[in-house]
């Protein structure tokens, strides 16, 4: 609720946060250069088991401009790929995550609503890399036999 009621403040906070992040990425690039392939830029979860935490319109209004500015700087000034962490049912906002310039989404919580790995690959596989997750971490992994886990992982690898 506060996020929606105080959007100007949210933009001010994110603007400053991204200013600091870019300064830090400048230092990191100078220190490690292309010895790093991928950088983790944001750990904000945008999903629960059943839904995303905001609409695509809200994501585009509040987060996308700031993430895009940071990711554009990284892509224009380094060789790095950028990954975004978000658990949950994020299918409705995945187009915004892609538009913000993220190269990779991690993890892929296939137990969350509409996060079917085949569907994700078919619809977005040429636009973003799905890294990590991708296996059933709530039923198969904790409760499956070693054989069931092995079969499940191999099946997911075929996607």
Q: What are the residue ranges of the model-derived segments?
A:
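Active-site loop segments of alpha/beta catalytic cores
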Residues: 1-159
């Amino acid at each position: 609720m506060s996020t929606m009621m105080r959007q100007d403040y949210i933009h001010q906070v994110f603007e400053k946060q991204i200013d600091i992040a870019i300064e830090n990425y400048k230092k990191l690039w100078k220190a490690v250069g292309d010895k790093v392939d991928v950088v983790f830029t944001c750990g904000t979860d945008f999903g629960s088991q059943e839904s995303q935490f905001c609409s695509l319109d809200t994501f585009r209004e509040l987060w996308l401009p700031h993430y895009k500015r940071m990711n554009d700087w990284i892509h224009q000034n380094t060789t790095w790929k950028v990954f975004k962490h978000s658990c949950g049912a994020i299918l409705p906002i995945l187009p915004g995550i892609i538009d913000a310039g993220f190269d990779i989404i991690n993890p892929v919580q296939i137990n969350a609503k509409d996060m079917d790995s085949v569907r994700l690959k078919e619809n977005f596989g040429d636009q973003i890399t799905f890294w990590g997750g991708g296996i059933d971490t709530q039923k198969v992994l904790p409760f499956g036999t070693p054989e069931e886990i092995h079969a499940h992982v191999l099946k997911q690898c075929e996607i």
